[in-house]
Amino acid sequence: LAPLAKRVFLAFPIAGRGDAEARSGDAPGARPASRSPWRRRAARKWVVSGRPVPAATGRADRAGARARFGIGADERCVLVFGGSLGARRLNDAALEAFGSASPCAVIHASGRRDHDDLRRRLDALGSPPHYHLRPYIEPFADALAAADLVVARAGGSVMELAAAGLPAVLVPYPHATADHQTGNARFIEQAGAAVVVPDAELDGPRLAREVGSLLAAPQRLGAMANAARALAKPDAAERIADELIALAR
């Protein structure tokens, strides 16, 4: 649709290749097909605006959010989520990694599709008190405020992680259109805010290792959190609105 639009708003420079690169239409490591004339024309319309996020993101009270889930002030907490329907591979890996024993509290928003099955499996493990399973969480800002680390896919919601200043283990969905989740994840990883695990490599032991190594390195986790905050674009909605108003004049 880009050739038909007057502006194309992008969450990440990797999608639009940065404002400067967008003007040339080239991308780092781009395939030759991506440098076609129509793409170069489309690139002139790209604006790396960021993605608007809910106003409460990054502003919820951490102590209150933790009290809601019954998580202590000094506990480490990992948030796992995969979208409204959930992500089965993430769901299975999280339960395998943290269901029986865990170095941290876990908030797991499973999505509706897998929730009942995961609940039965968790009950079979004795319903461990450190594992907080929900089909969804509303307001989601509370879950973000309670967490120290996130395990998630790499769709548009990663901008909420940036706004909340949260480091992440990202598992891109491999069948997303044009594999855009891998592009998102690698951009965030290169910025120092995430570790990327390919979907085909994810299982319980791998997830436990990745999370365990990050939680055991608080300085690294803090640096990743700072890198995440640096990616945030809190004025994304205003920038998009300004561009649209300018076009309408």
Region locations from a protein language model:
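Donor-nucleotide binding loops and adjacent catalytic segments primarily
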Residues: A27, S34-S36, R62-L149, T182-R186, ...
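A donor-sugar binding/catalytic signature common to diverse glycosyltransferases
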Residues: F140-Q181
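Short, hydrophobic alpha-helical segments
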Residues: V211, L215-Q219, L244-R249
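C-terminal alpha-helical cap of glycosyltransferases
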Residues: K233-R249
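A short, well-ordered alpha-helix in the C-terminal region of glycosyltransferases
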Residues: R220-P234
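Short, glycine/polar-rich helix-capping loops at beta-to-alpha or helix-loop-helix junctions
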Residues: A11-D19, S157-V158, A178-A185
